[in-house]
């Protein structure tokens, strides 16, 4: 199984040339592909923050449209949950000294729980998680 990190899902959702190439490669690879509730949270929170920044209702139209588009995007994917197994792995790695961002560590622990490969641009942080397999399919 392949798990898309937030930076990979964002490229696909934007329809960027790199995202289009990634989507084509995913279709051809034959592996099951998922993302995580953590990536969905990060992506959705970004648009919610944009909405909160705008004080005029007409300035909120585009961020709300993008929020809806993002929700629709994630509804088309298998989204893996944050569960007790991932939470236990998170605690184990934190007490074991892994010091990366909480959201990245949550994504890593979901991947470990599913014995999956994380597709990410962030190899610096993800390489600090023992046993985690990760690849960058964008660059």
Identify the meaning behind each predicted range.
Residues 13-16, 47, 94, 130, ...:
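Short, flexible helix/strand-to-coil boundary loops that buttress conserved ligand/catalytic motifs
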Residues 4-5, 100-101, 122:
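Histidine- and aromatic-rich ligand-binding microenvironments
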Residues 8, 39, 86, 107, ...:
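Alpha-helix capping/helix-boundary segments
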Residues 37-38, 83, 122, 138:
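Residues at the C-termini of beta-strands that transition into short coil/loop
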Residues 45-51, 73-119:
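Active-site neighborhoods of divalent-metal-dependent phosphate/nucleic-acid chemistry enzymes
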Residues 1-38, 49-65:
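Short, well-structured N-terminal submotif of metal-dependent ribonuclease cores
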